[in-house]
Amino acid sequence: MSTKSRTRSKTRLSRALGIPLTPKAAKYLEKRPYAPGEHGRSKRKQDSDYAVRLREKQRLRAQYGIREAQLKIAFQEARRTQGLTGENLVEILEQRLDALVVRSGLARTTAQARQLVVHRHIMVDGKIVDRPSFRVKAGQMIHVKPRSEGTEPFQVAAAGGHADVLPKLPSYLEVELDKLQARLVRLPKRAEVPVTCEVQLVVEYYAAR
């Protein structure tokens, strides 16, 4: 799929879910804040309970850019963990390496963060990690491989070039962009994680399966 096609696909998905998944999609949603299709402007008919829960699950999955199987595994772990399942789920997903790379400003989008990880530009505590799903633990340091620091994507990041599209830095991260590094100082809490999702609806979706 070409870059143009991927952008168009993300924009269409953003409109369908009602959330911006990329900076370009955010601008598009400002102009057309309705679902794609010829009837997008008209008032939508009342969705069924199942449709509402399904859409909320899709919104969470899309914001982390993960497959259904990955989300289901995370949900099963969240259900086994003490506490509220929905909150546990978001907190588990937020510990993904690709999520923290974009959250810290080292990448502009989740897709770019995943690419940087897969191409072995990212290290955790001095060791290269090429799995976007890698679970970062509290206290661990995420940083750019020294040989990659001078490349254009990281020079842009070091200059704060993504600040215009990323949410405010959450307090569970300590970031030094000039050094291209970020530390997960503690585990995230759901209320701090900048994702749009009614997590209880996601719990209800899986509970009914």
UniProtKB/Swiss-Prot annotation:
Q: Which Pfam families match?
A: Ribosomal_S4, S4
Q: Where is the composition biased (Basic residues)?
A: 1-13
Start and end residues of each stretch annotated as Disordered: 1-20, 28-49
Keywords for the protein's UniProt record, in alphabetical order: Ribonucleoprotein, Ribosomal protein, RNA-binding, rRNA-binding
Keyword Membrane on entry: no
User: Please, which domain of life does this record's source organism belong to?
Assistant: Bacteria
Report domain S4 RNA-binding positions.
95-176
Any GO molecular function: rRNA binding
User: What does the entry list under GO cellular component?
Assistant: small ribosomal subunit
Please list the GO biological process terms of this entry: ribosomal small subunit biogenesis; translation
Keyword Thylakoid in record: no
What the entry lists under InterPro entries is as follows:
Ribosomal_uS4 (IPR022801), Ribosomal_uS4_bac-type (IPR005709), Ribosomal_uS4_CS (IPR018079), Ribosomal_uS4_N (IPR001912), S4_RNA-bd (IPR002942), S4_RNA-bd_sf (IPR036986)
Assembly description? Part of the 30S ribosomal subunit. Contacts protein S5. The interaction surface between S4 and S5 is involved in control of translational fidelity.
In terms of PANTHER family, this protein maps to:
30S 40S RIBOSOMAL PROTEIN, SMALL RIBOSOMAL SUBUNIT PROTEIN US4M
Q: Which family does it belong to?
A: Belongs to the universal ribosomal protein uS4 family.
The job of this chain, per UniProt, is described as: One of the primary rRNA binding proteins, it binds directly to 16S rRNA where it nucleates assembly of the body of the 30S subunit.
> In its UniProt entry, what is this protein called?
Small ribosomal subunit protein uS4
Record the organism: Clavibacter michiganensis subsp. michiganensis (strain NCPPB 382)
